[in-house]
């Protein structure tokens, strides 16, 4: 490495986060921040990219980057192979955490909650608007399973292309969406001298309560 890790740092000076300017509903604040990220983050950065953390049946944590594909008053939706490693982990322990980081805005959002599968109709609706290659890939790839080499994956894709040569692929039963039902949402805004702003929303008795956390 050309630079010491201990010397890598930057000052956060772009903005602040005060209770006076933060709505009581965390979904409203998330939408505001997400819209800001869409306008500000430079391509090819994907503002809907997030880290999804899960825990397997043995208590081991796992995380990976996914794309947020839905947001409404119920929660945050993403799609994957139900038979993948993350799918098996969510079946064993249906709780997860998400983290969004928008460095250009010096902002981070952490979300924790329970997981539910979306309906088959919701999964199919999203599947049908995906590019054809992605739809075929959902059939072809045995996600998270060991394969011999890249050639095996390409062979599986070729077989899938032949299978659906004369018909549009339907949504596989092993593929679909999950929704994270948030119980906690924390908004982090970088500030100078590492004295960051942190507003923590917790869902209690059907309402959202908000507190400020020390950085």
From Swiss-Prot:
Binding-site residues for FMN, renumbered to this chain: 64-69, 79-80, 86, 108, 143-144, 188, 198
Signal sequence, start to end: none
Binding, substrate: 9-12, 69, 126, 130, 134, 194-196
Cofactor(s) recorded in Swiss-Prot or TrEMBL: FMN
Catalytic activity, as annotated: pyridoxamine 5'-phosphate + O2 + H2O = pyridoxal 5'-phosphate + H2O2 + NH4(+); pyridoxine 5'-phosphate + O2 = pyridoxal 5'-phosphate + H2O2
UniProt keyword list: Flavoprotein, FMN, Oxidoreductase, Pyridoxine biosynthesis
Pfam families membership: PNP_phzG_C, PNPOx_N
Main enzyme class: oxidoreductase
The record's free-text note on cofactor binding: Binds 1 FMN per subunit.
GO molecular function term, any single one: FMN binding
InterPro entries: Pyridox_Oxase, Pyridox_Oxase_CS, Pyridox_Oxase_N, Pyridoxamine_oxidase_dimer_C, Split_barrel_FMN-bd
GO terms classed as biological process: pyridoxine biosynthetic process
Listed pathway(s): Cofactor metabolism; pyridoxal 5'-phosphate salvage; pyridoxal 5'-phosphate from pyridoxamine 5'-phosphate: step 1/1; Cofactor metabolism; pyridoxal 5'-phosphate salvage; pyridoxal 5'-phosphate from pyridoxine 5'-phosphate: step 1/1
Enzyme Commission number, as recorded: 1.4.3.5
PANTHER family in the record: PYRIDOXINE-5'-PHOSPHATE OXIDASE, PYRIDOXINE-5-PHOSPHATE OXIDASE
Family affiliation: Belongs to the pyridoxamine 5'-phosphate oxidase family.
Subunit structure: Homodimer.
Cited function: Catalyzes the oxidation of either pyridoxine 5'-phosphate (PNP) or pyridoxamine 5'-phosphate (PMP) into pyridoxal 5'-phosphate (PLP).
Protein name as catalogued: Pyridoxine/pyridoxamine 5'-phosphate oxidase
Record organism: Pseudomonas paraeruginosa (strain DSM 24068 / PA7) (Pseudomonas aeruginosa (strain PA7))
Gene that encodes it: pdxH
């Amino acid at each position: 490495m050309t630079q010491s890790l201990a010397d890598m740092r930057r000052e956060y000076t772009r903005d602040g986060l005060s209770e006076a300017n933060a709505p009581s509903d965390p979904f409203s604040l998330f939408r505001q921040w997400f819209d800001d990220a869409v306008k500000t983050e430079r391509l090819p950065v994907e503002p809907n990219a997030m880290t999804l953390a899960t825990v397997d049946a043995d208590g081991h944590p796992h995380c990976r980057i996914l794309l947020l594909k839905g947001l409404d008053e119920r929660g945050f939706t993403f799609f994957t192979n139900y038979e993948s490693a993350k799918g098996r982990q969510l079946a064993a322990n249906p709780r997860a955490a998400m983290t969004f980081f928008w460095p250009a805005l010096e902002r981070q959002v952490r979300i924790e909650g329970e997981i539910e599968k979306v309906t088959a109709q919701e999964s199919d609706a999203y599947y049908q608007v995906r590019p054809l290659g992605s739809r075929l890939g959902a059939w072809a790839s045995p996600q998270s399973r060991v394969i011999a080499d890249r050639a095996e994956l390409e062979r599986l894709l070729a077989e899938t292309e032949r299978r659906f040569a004369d018909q549009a692929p339907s949504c596989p039963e092993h593929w679909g969406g999950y929704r994270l039902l948030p119980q906690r949402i924390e908004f982090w805004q970088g500030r100078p001298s590492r004295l960051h702003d942190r507003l923590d929303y917790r869902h209690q008795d059907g309402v959202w309560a908000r507190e400020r956390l020390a950085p």
